[in-house]
């Protein structure tokens, strides 16, 4: 690995892990830069307003809020050293309706890796510097979830995803032991593989008649089924039937995002939540999710009590029901049903959303790069020999893992992390922040910065090829933070990676796929990066997989 990089511009920035010149692919993912490429469906933005038409509203502040932020900073003798971005409506008119994190990247190129942005009723310090991100994420006592907790409490309640202080410490300590190695091994065989195989079975009809399929939708169904079985031992069966939970989760997450930039937090007024259509829709969505989780908890609790089950070993797995819910109930921890519901709801939402997005964008990137796709399928064929993957196979699927990590670099989930300063602090670079200051850590900016990554806008899986541990925030010095970092790093990172590797291995082993031409692949956000209109592909059964399966059965 090369020496640590400076974020100061250099004549020839080096990649974090040097790609092989002969094997590295050179396609460009969905990004601001590729929107003008002829016949390229990877444009990152929705179409702009028509000439002469009314200007759409924006999450970004009007000019007067930017001016006010700049005036207040100057008038108070700010001294923070943080430049104020000119967030004019015209600057983002071509991005409206698309991905909200893309304007942040545009302004980073103009103002540098840290700047102040007036957005709605607040001003944010936007960070695209790994050293500053490391400082904020590691100093948990100085920086809290803040705004994130405020706007998503209606969904997560007191769940560990947004809890603070002693409650967060206690809940994380209770949940983490359930994600042990033996549990993950069981999930690979009994959940991840089987759900992926059910997806392949579902797609066989489309493979025979050539019907285009929305792979984003299919991956969302797959991951909901997987998270249902792994967390609750319950099959949502969304691959074969419509699931109201998927729509409810997406509606709730979009509401949380909207609340973060509302000019007035009217959703704090209870009676308004009963009459405003957007709030009515959000409350109905949360009710669907909570009712589902509460019923599953009650059913499992009844079984555990009737059997008198207790955990008798560190890596405990109930053979009939290896779910996280069963582990938590069998641990006999004194916790209210409400708290347990909120904790498990956090896992349901985060686990479903994140992995579905990882699968969607990795498949998209592979569909645009024949060389990497061929290399990934050859590796899968060599390692698996026509059989389903096992837990022991995962470490052998090195190139496929590189593809997933590179997808996470280009399309991080979430693309932005938000923290709030609880005390006065001085950031690396001598930038000063006051108590109450909201900070946006733009993971997207860090992952796309040409000062951090060589060929930053290109899909180069080989940059992550290493014989050592998988890349993470620690061994990349916070240049790669797909699962956040510090004490509040995602507890399910290994779970998400294993599920992604297994699902893609099964899919690549059994199916060929091509992107439907002339479709516009644009981005929007919930908690993760979604496509605006789906990811449509045509699939076919692989003859290689059938031959290998036949050979291995002899």
Spans of features found by a protein language model:
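N-terminal membrane-proximal hinge/A-helix region immediately C-terminal to the signal-anchor transmembrane segment
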Residues: 2-158, 163-166, 170, 191-202, ...
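Cytochrome P450 catalytic-domain helical core, especially the substrate-recognition surface
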Residues: 64-105, 123, 149-232, 244-299, ...
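Conserved cytochrome P450 K-helix E-x-x-R motif and the immediately C-terminal K′/meander segment
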Residues: 91-112, 291, 295, 387-429, ...
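Conserved cytochrome P450 catalytic core segment spanning the I/J/K helices
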Residues: 180-181, 282-359, 392-397, 420, ...
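Central I-helix of cytochrome P450 enzymes
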Residues: 223, 227, 231-232, 285, ...
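Cytochrome P450 heme-thiolate "Cys pocket" and heme-binding signature region
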Residues: 350, 467-500, 524-526
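Cytochrome P450 heme-binding "Cys pocket" and the immediately downstream C-terminal segment
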Residues: 370-372, 439, 494-530, 534
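Conserved cytochrome P450 K-helix/beta-meander segment immediately N-terminal to the heme-binding cysteine loop
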Residues: 441-471
């Amino acid at each position: 690995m090369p020496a640590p990089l400076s974020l100061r511009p250099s004549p020839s920035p080096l990649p974090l892990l040097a790609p092989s010149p002969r094997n590295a692919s050179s396609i460009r993912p969905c990004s601001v830069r590729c929107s003008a490429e002829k016949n390229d469906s990877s444009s990152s933005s929705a179409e702009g307003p028509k000439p002469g038409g009314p200007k759409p509203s924006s999450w970004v502040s009007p000019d007067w809020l930017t001016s006010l932020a700049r005036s207040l900073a100057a008038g108070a003798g700010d001294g923070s050293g943080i430049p104020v971005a000119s967030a004019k409506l015209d600057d983002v008119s071509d991005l409206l309706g698309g991905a909200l994190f893309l304007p942040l990247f545009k302004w980073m190129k103009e103002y540098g890796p840290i700047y102040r942005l007036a957005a709605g009723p607040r001003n944010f310090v936007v960070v695209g510097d790994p050293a500053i991100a490391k400082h904020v994420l590691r100093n948990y006592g100085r920086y809290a979830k803040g705004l994130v907790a405020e706007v998503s409490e209606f969904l997560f309640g007191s769940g560990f995803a947004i809890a603070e202080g002693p409650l967060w410490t206690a809940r994380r300590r209770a949940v983490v032991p359930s994600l042990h190695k033996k549990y993950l091994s069981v999930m690979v065989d009994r959940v991840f593989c089987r759900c992926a195989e059910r997806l392949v079975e579902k797609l066989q009809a489309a493979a025979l008649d050539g019907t285009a399929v929305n792979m984003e939708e299919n991956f969302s169904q797959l991951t909901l089924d997987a998270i249902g079985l792994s967390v609750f031992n319950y099959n949502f069966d969304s691959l074969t039937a419509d699931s109201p939970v998927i729509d409810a989760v997406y509606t709730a997450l979009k509401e949380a995002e909207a609340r973060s930039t509302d000019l007035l937090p009217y959703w704090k007024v209870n009676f308004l939540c009963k009459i405003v259509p957007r709030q009515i829709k959000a409350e109905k969505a949360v009710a669907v999710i909570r009712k589902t989780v509460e019923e599953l908890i009650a059913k499992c609790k009844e079984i555990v009590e009737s059997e008198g089950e207790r955990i008798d070993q560190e890596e405990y797995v109930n053979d009939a029901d290896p779910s996280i819910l069963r582990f938590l109930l069998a641990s006999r921890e004194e916790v209210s049903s409400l708290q347990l519901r909120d904790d498990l709801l956090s896992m349901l939402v985060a686990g479903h959303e994140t992995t579905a997005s990882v699968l969607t964008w990795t498949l998209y990137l592979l569909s645009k790069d024949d060389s990497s796709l061929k290399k990934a399928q050859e590796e899968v064929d060599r390692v698996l020999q026509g059989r389903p993957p096992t837990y022991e196979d995962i470490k052998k699927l090195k190139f496929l893992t590189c593809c997933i990590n590179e997808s996470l670099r280009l399309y991080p989930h979430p693309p932005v992390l938000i923290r709030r300063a609880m005390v006065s602090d001085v950031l690396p670079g001598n930038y000063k922040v006051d108590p109450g200051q909201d900070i946006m850590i733009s993971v997207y900016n860090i992952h796309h910065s040409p000062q951090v990554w060589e060929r930053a806008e290109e899909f180069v899986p080989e940059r992550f090829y290493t014989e050592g541990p998988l890349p993470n925030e620690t061994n990349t010095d916070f240049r790669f933070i797909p699962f956040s970092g510090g004490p509040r790093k995602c507890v399910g990172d290994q779970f998400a990676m294993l599920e992604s590797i297994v699902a893609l291995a099964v899919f690549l082993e059994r199916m060929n796929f091509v992107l439907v031409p002339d479709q516009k692949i644009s981005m929007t956000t919930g908690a993760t990066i979604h496509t605006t209109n789906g990811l449509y592909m045509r699939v076919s059964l692989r003859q290689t997989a059938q031959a290998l399966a036949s050979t291995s059965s002899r």
